[in-house]
A protein has these predicted regions:
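Core segments of small alpha/beta cavity-forming domains
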Residues: 68-145
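Secondary-structure transition/hinge residues
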Residues: 1, 107-111, 206
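Secondary-structure junction/capping motif
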Residues: 1, 89, 189-190
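Bacterial N-terminal signal peptides that target proteins for export
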Residues: 1-8
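Structured, amphipathic secondary-structure segments that form assembly/contact surfaces
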Residues: 16, 115-226
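Juxtamembrane and targeting peptides
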Residues: 9-97
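Aromatic side chains
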Residues: 21, 103-107, 210
Length: 227
């Protein structure tokens, strides 16, 4: 079993999940980019935008509606929050934004109960897409969605050429699977296992999107535990 699947099976078994929102974000597409991928600001505009300190991403925020904006839709009872990475440069911010889109789109698919939701696939290689689809399908087969809240923090990115390494922590202590039909929440004890470290290798494609070519997770990671 992969580290990624093991990490999210913890979601299902112990009631810890990272997931979506009935939150709508319209963001600028990458159509204005030049052949070199455009500016970092343009590269980072599709998907979930970094927000000021620990502010929920979603309907509580006024998104900049732009031509060809993208929709992120997550369960009504769920909040996904990204802490900013103020020390990242413009290019690194583009990587962090695309990794955030991947993360949010994955849980959009979980929330919709649709393992074939196309959005997460735009930000993942075939191998990563297959891993994520397996997890989404598990939720779908059990009739689960997600509820509660997840905080994504300690986000980092390092770029070497057209390859980047991104990492982020997910605090999922307040997130749980919920039976879609009954609304029953699968509560369980939480602890250090509720802090997950995600690592992704990302490569920029011809459209300027940073796509995850590998993705792993680690539970109770020291780098993610509260100090």
């Amino acid at each position: 079993m992969s580290q990624l699947l093991a990490g999210v099976l913890l979601v299902a078994i112990t009631g810890v999940a990272a997931g979506g929102c009935s939150l709508v974000k319209d963001e600028q597409r990458r159509s204005a980019r030049g052949s070199a991928g455009g500016t970092a600001a343009e590269v980072s505009r599709e998907g979930v935008r970094d927000q000021a300190a620990v502010k929920p991403v979603g309907s509580a925020l006024s998104a900049s509606a732009a031509t060809g904006g993208i929709l992120i839709e997550l369960p009504q009872s769920f909040t996904l929050t990204f802490e900013p990475a103020p020390h990242a440069g413009a290019d690194e911010q583009a990587v962090l934004t695309d990794s955030a889109v991947l993360f949010a789109a994955w849980y959009q698919a979980i929330g919709r109960g649709d393992a074939d939701d196309p959005l997460y696939g735009r930000y993942a290689s075939a191998g990563v897409r297959a891993k994520l689809r397996e997890i989404i399908a598990m939720f779908q087969a059990n009739g689960w969605t997600v509820t509660g809240s997840v905080l994504v923090n300690r986000r980092t990115a390092k770029i070497t050429g057209d390859t980047a390494r991104a990492a982020w922590c997910a605090d999922v202590r307040e997130a749980f699977p919920m039976e879609s039909s009954s609304g029953h929440v699968l509560h369980s004890p939480t602890g250090d296992q509720s802090f997950l470290l995600y690592r992704a290798t990302m490569r920029r494609n011809g459209a300027g999107i940073w796509v995850a070519s590998s993705l792993t997770s680690q539970r109770a990671a020291a780098a993610c535990l509260p100090s």
